Amino acid sequence: MVVDVESRTASVTGEKMAARGCDACMKRSRASWYCPADDAFLCQSCDASIHSANHLAKRHERVRLQSSSPTETADKTTSVWYEGFRRKARTPRSKSCAFEKLLQIESNDPLVPELGGDEDDGFFSFSSVEETEESLNCCVPVFDPFSDMLIDDINGFCLVPDEVNNTTTNGELGEVEKAIMDDEGFMGFVPLDMDLEDLTMDVESLLEEEQLCLGFKEPNDVGVIKEENKVGFEINCKDLKRVKDEDEEEEEAKCENGGSKDSDREASNDKDRKTSLFLRLDYGAVISAWDNHGSPWKTGIKPECMLGGNTCLPHVVGGYEKLMSSDGSVTRQQGRDGGGSDGEREARVLRYKEKRRTRLFSKKIRYEVRKLNAEQRPRIKGRFVKRTSLLT
């Protein structure tokens, strides 16, 4: 047996065999190992899985084929779908060829001169390619028309030299204003030393001119602007007290002049009220007029009317009364409060109980009649179905 294994190994190593496939996976994978004990050509993956199964398989002596290099791993049999794709870089590449070409193309174009720069420079100058790349990729360009080197005085205007005098004695424009108006690039800029009060006065003068143009204000109107330190309004208590005192004095003067007239009017009003309170009827004349028709009162006695208290007449509120008039008999019904004697109330209660009793009795009779009719002709679906009839 040992001789047979050695002979197989010698035959395999001695012959220059062509590339052979794996006997285990039966694929086009190139065999890397030959096992004389199993007499099989195996690839790298199949050799590892077969000879690591148990201790006996691990003892097998295997021969590496010459066709495979010692550092060769398992070859790819099929191409994967993501083969050829590369992961995109997280950060932009520096010194790209496309960017250098773009810089070469743009270098021929004229550039805008830097504001506040030296005249010798003339144009913008790029310090280095790396610096411009960083500014283009990561930063937003900021336009800064002013330079720290040119600002000599904080209170002065930016591009005006110190020799120029800003003040003028007459109303003509100074040198600073002329320089500002002549320079097209700085049209509309305000000198930094201009006070806020001067600016507000200029705005107010412009507003007055607009009001004159629009017709809101006449040219002859001359007004004085009062400067207020605080915004809002204040109530002067002294002025209010003075106004109140004036009103009180006017009222006192009116009372002194027309006091007699007001007192006469009040006295006449009091007399009218007293006469209206002490108004009385001639009950004798009323009774004589109603003598043929009977007494208008239920009890036949004149009640005592108290005008200061409740004016409701309890003698007329409840019950039924027949009052005779010239047209005929008039029936006065009972009041809202349902008042009356105890006998009338008991009679009403008895009538209600009797009505309720008869209603329940009629309902019970109707129920019994329906039940009898249902028993005479039984139905499959219904309440009154006799069980005996269904069983028979």
UniProtKB/Swiss-Prot annotation:
Gene name linked to the record: COL7
Ranges of biased composition (kind: Basic and acidic residues): 259-271
Superkingdom, taxonomy of origin: Eukaryota
Keyword DNA repair part of the UniProt annotation: no
PANTHER family: CCT MOTIF FAMILY PROTEIN, EXPRESSED (PTHR31874), ZINC FINGER PROTEIN CONSTANS-LIKE 7 (PTHR31874:SF55)
Protein name: Zinc finger protein CONSTANS-LIKE 7
Cellular component GO terms, alphabetical: nucleolus
Entry coiled-coil feature ranges: 226-254
Annotated ranges, domain CCT: 345-387
Chain spans, region Disordered: 246-271, 326-346
